[in-house]
Amino acid sequence: FSSRAESGSAFQRLWEYCDILIVPGHADYCFDQKYGFRDYRGGGRSSGRETIGRVAAGAIASKLLGELGIVLTTYAKSIGPVTVDEADYDFTEITNNSFYLPNKDAAKKAAEYVSTLMEQMDSCGGLIECRVDHLPAGLGEPVFDKLDALLAQAIMSIGAVKGVEIGDGFQSASSTGSTNNDPFCMQQGQVMKTSNHPVELWVA
């Protein structure tokens, strides 16, 4: 299988980079130290443009998994200080706004916030949440190839990602062993869990 993708926003504005020796928060310095060269124009292996191949492959993978009954739902949980509480999720709104927020009001607030930052020539971060439904048990291998370990490695390889939480993540540190677990039960003849503490994926 082969594919080709063209990015309409990949135009390099060289004049915006020529006066910058080392770009803060980017891989410029590390690349220069490791390879003795860095491309100040952007677009190299450390560029966000590299993820276009992942987007294409991910779209195909999502379709294939759908044929197996596995459903992936990914959306922005927060944009800067604008956060959506789980009780206010409306998944029908995800594709109705450019931020993929599952809430109409939050999307409007995020648009206003980002617009203000753009006027100030600034930017912000966010939190992405991914849910997988109907995933079969037994995926992954012991120790280094556990499913959550492989997911964390793949996601952390994206340059802009600075943190990954599986399930309740760091909140588990303030929890107890008796509450931070998922007891098993039988529902309609199938083994199910009564809660979902350790398996929901958050990306920042």
Where are these regions (language model features)?
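Short, functionally important structural connectors and interaction interfaces within domains
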Residues: 21, 32, 44, 153-156, ...
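Residues in well-ordered beta-strands of folded domains
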Residues: 1-2, 30-32, 75-77, 131-133, ...
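Residue-level signal for pocket-adjacent positions within structured domains
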Residues: 24, 28, 35, 179, ...
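Intrinsically disordered, low-complexity boundary segments flanking structured domains
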Residues: 15-16, 115-119, 151-153
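Glycine-rich, mobile lid/loop segments that gate access to catalytic sites or pores
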Residues: 33-143
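Glycine-rich anion/phosphate-binding loop at the beta-strand->alpha-helix junction
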Residues: 121-204
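Glycine-rich, N-terminal phosphate-binding loop and its surrounding beta-alpha-beta segment
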Residues: 1-28
